[in-house]
Structure formats: C-alpha cells, structure tokens
Amino acid sequence: MNALPSTIVAIATAAGTGGIGIVRLSGPQSVQIAAALGIAGLQSRHARYARFRDAQGEVIDDGIAVWFPAPHSFTGEEVVELQGHGSPVLLRQLVARCIALGARQARAGEFSERAFLNGKLDLAQAEAIADLIAAGDLRAARAARRSLDGVFSRRVDAVSESLTRLRIHVEAAIDFADEPLDTLGGAQVREELTRTRALLAQLLRDAERGRKLRDGLHAVLIGPPNAGKSSLLNALAGSDRAIVTDVAGTTRDTLHEAIQLDGFELTLVDTAGLREGGDAIEREGMRRARAELQRADLALIVLDARDPQAARDALGDAIDAVPRRLWIHNKCDLLAVAGPMDADAIAVSAVTGQGLEHLHTRLRELALGDGIESVDGEFSARTRHVDALHRAEQHADAADLELRYEQLELAAEELRLAHEALGEITGKLSADDLLGKIFSSFCIGK
C-alpha cells in the first residue's frame, strides 16, 4: 500500500440541501480529527451517534460517525464518515473545522485516486464509479456497475496474460536465434497469438457496445431546408424543443435533445438545412451541421416525401462521412397518393405521427448495432478504452505478420506495444499526466 501522509476531507454528498449530508475524511489523522470534533469511542464499522463541535465546544451538528480502519476501507486508508443533516451551511462549517484540525480539502476525484494508488481498484473500475454516478439510464447504470465489479478489467487482464506468455516465448526464441522458430514451438506460439487476437477482437466489439451504453448514441438530423427536421425532433422528443415555421432555413444553430429508447439514451441533434447559398448566419449553421456529421454515430437523413430524389441530390456528398444512415421521408401525409419509396427509407409524418412507431423501432435496432437486447456481462467503457483496444489489436495483428516471416525482434516489439496499450486501460502502465486528467474529472468527495 502506498503511504500518503496527508489527511483529506470533502463533502461526499451531492450539492444542495437534503435530508442527509456526509463529510468524508481519509488519511492517518482521520480518527484523531474525529476525536477533536467530540466523537469518542469509535469502533470499527460501527455507527456511533455524536455531536460534532467547533473549537469553542459549540455544536455544529449532530449525527452518525462511522470509522473504517485501514486497509479495509474504500481508499485503503483510515476513513471516517460524518453523517449529519444535509444543510450546505453546516456541511461547509464541518469541513472547515476538519481543515483547522489538520486535514486539507480533497481535490476532485482524490478519494478514488487514493483507492487506485492503494490497490483497492484499478483505473477502469475507478472510472466506472464516475460512470455509475452519471448514468443516464438503468441499462447504462447496470453496465457501469459491472465495470466497477471488475468484469471489464478481468477480460483485459486475460488478454494481457496471454500476451505475457507470448512475449516470454518470443523473447526466448530470440535468445536461440540459430534455431528455426518451429523447433522452438513456433506453431504453438502462432496458435496462441491467433486465440489472443480473437479474444481481443471480441473484447473490442464489446467495449464499443459499452462505450455506446455509457455515452449514448449521437444521431444527427440532416437534410435540406424545410424538410421537417425540427418538427421530427419535436415529435421524437415529445415536446416543442425546436422552433418550427414554414420559412426555409429557420434552424440556424445545432440543438441537442436526449431521448430514451427502452432504457438506452439517444441524443438527437437538429441542424441547419443544407443547400447552396444562404446568408452568413445560415452558412455558419451549415458548417456546424457538417461538423456534427463528423462526430455522428448515425445520420437521420430527412427528406421531403413529395420529392425525395431532388432532396437527395441537394445533399451531395455531405453524408458520406457517416457509415450508418437512416433515410426518412417526412411529410408523407401531404401525398395525395403514395409515391415511390426507396427500399431503405421510412415514411413518416412528424405532424400526424404516422410512421413514428416504425421509426422508433428502427432507431432501437440501430442503437447498439447488433441488436437491442441486453447482453449478459455487458460493461461500461470509455472512448479511451476503445482507442487503447484498437491500438492493441493493430499491434497484435502486426506481430502476427512479423511471426509469419520469423522477424522475432519486430514481433516482440509489437507484442510489447500491444501489452502497453492494454495496461493503459487498467492503469498498470499509465503515465501520471493521464491519471491526473482522469481523476480531475470526478466529483469532489469521490
């Protein structure tokens, strides 16, 4: 366990008033500070009623104190939690008193950082705490809970252990360079690498799914002016979030709205209509629309059902950047007779609601790419995890190629780089600046 001499303190409950507020202490002076507050006779993991007093002996608040001795606490250090009334004034006074007694104000995420540094959890698990708190729906919360329980980390460790075995074999073969690789178990090494690459590819697919569970799907409504994009956003959101008029080009800026699809969060982005010309403000809106497309998981291409082909032509190559697209023929209620429909398009009316149920179904199907049903063991992941897995996969693929040509030194280097990429996920090979960025994004008191 790493020795961290300072004792830190922070409010651990959410900002604002509430029935209960918690102040958390962690560090070697936690019990002594609690005693100076007037809390005597603390027993391990026993709740004790006490009055919390200031320097003059006046009662700041009363409540429950709980002591978690090291190393059997969240941070691995001496921890005392003071549970009083949820008054911000009283909680701040209690923190100030703890600081006067020798503690210091905790940095954002410092409790979780200490838990990581003391080996109570790895980096992916620490991040899962923040993801669990910020989860926008039940499914994302359950996925974050699994990551906190170590589901993701154990799978990363399994691939990492396989890479370790491979590196040992390849490094040993380098030491016997005069011997052909096959006489040194080269066939078994290649088989092991094939299995490892398969495990890594599956882990990457599952992490992509976990990233979408955490972040939700980013769907951009794109199309020519006056196709009904804003009306469709309002219809899907169930409220008048966007301004709607008969004037083409009403939408000048992007508008984000999160909706729930069977427990999955989908962020809809309304954008300015794409067309040639327009004034300076409209052109800036179109530039932002194209920028949103670059970040989109899904493009919802909204066309006027009365002349969809002309609307398609007007878009040009703007949608080429998005691999996943859903074509929507809006205003189908204005058709005197049903016109020709593209096989991949959905006919809807944002005004009457016609076709919206079908659209919801297709959005649910597209939400996770390979089905909408919850998968056993699905976990939460972040973009940085997915990026690290991509790099690990690329290096493992390169190692396989080098082994085929018996370029052992190059194969060993590629395996090392793959191993390092995986280590970034759990924090076993992470630079200090990366750790600082990650934990600084946490809440104070976590």
Curated annotation (Swiss-Prot):
Q: Which coenzymes or cofactors are required?
A: K(+)
Q: Does the keyword Iron apply?
A: no
Q: Which positions fall inside the TrmE-type G domain? A: 216-368
EC class name: hydrolase
Domain of life per record: Bacteria
Query: EC number(s) of the enzyme?
Result: 3.6.-.-
Could you tell me which Pfam families the record lists for this protein? MMR_HSR1, MnmE_helical, TrmE_N
Give the multimer and partner information.
Answer: Homodimer. Heterotetramer of two MnmE and two MnmG subunits.
Its protein name is tRNA modification GTPase MnmE
